[in-house]
Amino acid sequence: MQIPVFEVRSDGRENLIGALIMAAYYDIPEVTVYFNNKLFRGNRTIKVDNSSLEAFESPNMLPIAHMDIDIKVNYDSIFRSPSVAPFVIHDRLCRNVGLLRIFPSISIENVRASLQPPTEGVVLQTFGAGNMPSHRTDIIDELKKAIDRGCLIINCSQCVRGQVDVQYLTGKILYDIGVIPGSDMTTEAALTKLSYVLSKDCWGLSKKKAMMVKNIRGELTVTQPKPLRDIEIVSQIARFLHLNTSHELEFLRHAILPQLLCHAADSGNVELLRALRENGANLSAIDYNGR
């Protein structure tokens, strides 16, 4: 809350009531933040204002729900676990992690000190889409030395919105030496994820690197490996209806995915189920009969 709950005029009561309603009546198995009539995914949320009722924001993802006269929930955006397993709490985090924010006049001594043992992981905050000055070969060399000794370095943008793109030359230089692209993770999420991944002693270095680019709990956006129109039946329907734009295909997706899921499950077509899940279909969704 921004205004204490004991004040006559407070946002605390509305935030508490809204949070309780969302938790009690909606199946959203996530850690979330409810504030000012919006429900955000926790690992996508940052605090952007300390003196406004619009205090929290999810810069790279729309809110999961919005509470107005009616409560609108974007069920497609809910991140559900792909498997059913007992609930386990992992209560250890690696503390040997840090932040290194790049700026034009940063000294090599500053960089070197941030990468020295016992540091095991660093979130590198770079410019724009994951870039840094290409002429600073001294920084590149220090980063490579740290990576070679097993330090995980994650490239995150200093910008609030957008994601790291390794297609740019200066961003590709970092990628080529082993810096892991952080996609559109917030700095806070990247640091927390790094602490979690590094604490898993049962994982080798390659597994830890792979987990940093994997979408574990909806903290980053992953490019879909198979476009929706590549599913044969969707492609045929789109052609028949002369649908071409992304908006039209998205509308088609919402219209037919429940039927496709039911058909695939009924016929035992595991390959189709897998393709539908890769394209964002919720295997726990209800059909048009509410089942």
Task: Please report, for each region that a protein language model flagged, where it lies by residue.
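Short, glycine-/small-residue-rich phosphate/pyrophosphate-handling segment
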Residues: 6-45, 204
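Conserved hydrophobic site in ankyrin repeats
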Residues: 275-276
